[in-house]
Amino acid sequence: MLLNRAWASQVLGSAVVLSTVAMRFVLWGRYCDNALEKRAPFREHHLAGLRQQQQDGLLITLGPTADSRQVFGIYEAESQEQVEALLHGDIYWREGIWVELSVYPWIQAL
C-alpha cells in the first residue's frame, strides 16, 4: 500500500513496517572549458564510480550532451541530499571537470 511518494507501507502479519521509498532526481550540470582534455586522467575512476552507483541501483543514466558542455543524469535515491553527496564525491566534481551541478526532484509521467 503506497502512503505517498516518500513512504511505503508493507504489512507483515499484523505489524505494519514503514520504509523509505526511492524517489527520482534529475541532474543538470556544466562542464569546464576543454573538458574532453582535462577529464582524461580521471575518466576511468569516474566511470568506475558511476558503474558502482548503477550496480547499487542509484544511477539510472548519466552522460554529456552532444557538445560536451552539459551533463545530464537521472538518479533513484532516498533523498536529494544523497544524490548531491554522490555527485560532490565524484572525481569530476573534485577535480573541477564539473563546474556546476543542479539536482531536482523529478516525477516520471510515462
Place the predicted regions along the sequence by residue.
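N-terminal chloroplast transit peptides
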Residues: 1-8
